[in-house]
């Protein structure tokens, strides 16, 4: 994926990513000076950096939608496994739960 090509100098923390996502929700494509506003909201990135981050995100999404990204191979897990912290009582409770 494209995001793996990013250098460490342009790495993003989870907090920066969350601020980026929130800013994208506020400043849509029709907002004047969108990337400057998003950069201000993130706080520690330039307009060029947030635009590049957005372009990488769009490319990643397109690759996922086109099935170019393989699904992860998950291990099967025994739900009743004591090592997972679930005992028989918990299993009976979950079995009888009704979500409303």
Swiss-Prot record:
<keyword id="KW-0805">Transcription regulation</keyword>
<feature type="domain" description="SANT">
    <location>
        <begin position="7"/>
        <end position="59"/>
    </location>
</feature>
<keyword id="KW-0804">Transcription</keyword>
<dbReference type="GO" id="GO:0003700">
    <property type="term" value="F:DNA-binding transcription factor activity"/>
</dbReference>
<dbReference type="GO" id="GO:0005634">
    <property type="term" value="C:nucleus"/>
</dbReference>
<comment type="function">
    <text>Probable transcription factor.</text>
</comment>
<protein>
    <recommendedName>
        <fullName>Protein RADIALIS-like 5</fullName>
    </recommendedName>
</protein>
<dbReference type="InterPro" id="IPR044636">
    <property type="entry name" value="RADIALIS-like"/>
</dbReference>
<dbReference type="InterPro" id="IPR001005">
    <property type="entry name" value="SANT/Myb"/>
</dbReference>
<dbReference type="InterPro" id="IPR009057">
    <property type="entry name" value="Homeodomain-like_sf"/>
</dbReference>
<keyword id="KW-0539">Nucleus</keyword>
């Amino acid at each position: 994926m494209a995001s793996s090509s990013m250098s460490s100098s342009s790495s993003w923390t989870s907090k920066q990513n969350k601020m980026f996502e929130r800013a994208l929700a506020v400043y849509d494509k029709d907002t004047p000076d969108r990337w400057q506003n998003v950069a201000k909201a993130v706080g520690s990135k330039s307009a060029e950096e947030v635009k590049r981050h957005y372009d990488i995100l769009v490319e990643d999404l397109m690759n996922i939608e086109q099935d170019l990204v393989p699904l992860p191979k998950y291990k099967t897990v025994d739900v009743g496994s004591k090592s997972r912290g679930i005992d028989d009582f918990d299993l009976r409770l979950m079995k009888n739960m009704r979500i409303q």
